[in-house]
Amino acid sequence: MATINANFNKLASGYLFPEIARRTALWQKRNPGVAVMRLGIGNTTEALPPAVQRAMKEKIDKLGDRRTYTGYGDEQGDTYLREAMVEYYKRWGVTLEPTEFFISDGAKSDAANIQQIFGPDNIVAVQDPAYPVYVDSNVVGGRSGSYNSERAQYDGFVYLTTSEEGDFIPTPPTGKVDLIYLCNPNNPTGAVSNHQEVKAFVDYAIANKAVIIYD
C-alpha cells in the first residue's frame, strides 16, 4: 500500500505567506476603509525594461520558426547565458567556468530542492528570522522533530537567533551542525553581514566540515 511522507504532518498550520494573506483579509474585513501597508511577499511593481522585452520577443520569434527552433535547452541552462555570466563576473575579478552555473526558476525552488542531496541525519542550523522555505523543506526532508508551539520552533533544528540589539546579524553555532542556511541580505530584516561576519561562518564550516547554503 502506498503511504505518504509522514513528515508533512509536522508542518505548522500553513505556509507563512498564505497565512499572512488570510489574516490580512480577515483584519481588513473587520476594519473597512483602513489602508494596509503590505510587507509580505516582495512582489514586482515595475514593467519589464525594453531590452528584456526585445530579447524575449527575439527568442520567441526564433522558436516560432522551424529553421531556428532549438528544442529543449541545455540541462544546466542555455550555454550562451552561462557564458555571459562568466563574462559578467570577470568585471569583479572573479574567474568562473560555465559549468559552475545552473540556471533555474529562482532561489526558492533551489533552496528547497538542494536539501535532497543531503542525508536525513544532518543537523541543520538556520538563521532566525529568515525565509521560511529553509525550515519547511528540511521538515519535509525528515531532519526535524515535532513543532514546538511554545517556542514557535521545530525541535531538532539549531536556530541562529538574531535581535535588533545585535543588528540582526547571526553568529556561528556553538555546537556541531552540518548544514547552515544563511540569508544575506536577510529576508525579512534587510540586515547585511560584512566580510568578517561571513568569514566567521566559512571558518566554522571548514573546521567542522559543514556546508553553507547561502541565499
Give residue ranges: language-model regions.
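N-terminal small-domain helix-loop-helix segment of the aminotransferase-like
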Residues: 3-6, 10-105, 113
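Generic enzyme active-site microenvironment
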Residues: 213
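Conserved core of the PLP fold type I
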Residues: 65-208
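Short, basic/glycine-rich phosphate-binding loops at helix/coil junctions
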Residues: 1-3, 181
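Residues at helix C-cap/C′ positions in short coil/turn segments immediately following an alpha-helix
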Residues: 32, 208-209
